[in-house]
Amino acid sequence: MELSAEYLREKLQRDLEAEHVEVEDTTLNRCSCSFRVLVVSAKFEGKPLLQRHRLVNACLAEELPHIHAFEQKTLTPDQWARERQK
């Protein structure tokens, strides 16, 4: 499976109706097997961190077996706005 930061970004944005998504390929040689993501979505409202991460994991269920390392940060739009003001 051919993975890229752009592919993951588009899928997360579409499936989670995210207002903001950042995906960084953190592999040393950029071989697309290690990623760090930030997802901002209203779908995370009222959900604890574990449920948010499960939503992201479910969205990327087909891709995760091909990824060696995956770090995620999940925020609601309000949390994202407060974080950007810091």
UniProtKB/Swiss-Prot annotation:
Positions carrying N-acetylmethionine are M1
InterPro entries, from UniProt?
A: BOL2, BolA, BolA-like_sf
- Supply the Pfam families for this chain: BolA
Whether Nucleus counts among this entry's keywords is yes
Question: Is Acetylation among the key words of this record?
Answer: yes
> Would you tell me the Gene Ontology cellular component terms?
cytoplasm; cytosol; iron-sulfur cluster assembly complex; nucleus
What keywords are annotated for this sequence in UniProt? Acetylation, Cytoplasm, Nucleus
A biological-process GO annotation: [2Fe-2S] cluster assembly
| GO MF entries | 2 iron, 2 sulfur cluster binding; iron-sulfur cluster binding
Question: Where in the cell is the protein located?
Answer: Cytoplasm; Nucleus
| Primary localisation category | cytoplasm
Give the source's domain of life in one word. Answer: Eukaryota
Per UniProt, subunit arrangement is: Interacts with GLRX3; forms a heterotrimeric complex composed by two BOLA2 molecules and one GLRX3 molecule; linked by [2Fe-2S] clusters.
Q: Which family does it belong to?
A: Belongs to the BolA/IbaG family.
Q: What does this protein do?
A: Acts as a cytosolic iron-sulfur (Fe-S) cluster assembly factor that facilitates [2Fe-2S] cluster insertion into a subset of cytosolic proteins. Acts together with the monothiol glutaredoxin GLRX3.
The record's section on PANTHER family has: BOLA-LIKE PROTEIN 2, BOLA-LIKE PROTEIN-RELATED
Q: What is this protein called?
A: BolA-like protein 2
Q: Which organism is it from?
A: Homo sapiens
Q: What is the lineage of its organism?
A: Eukaryota, Metazoa, Chordata, Craniata, Vertebrata
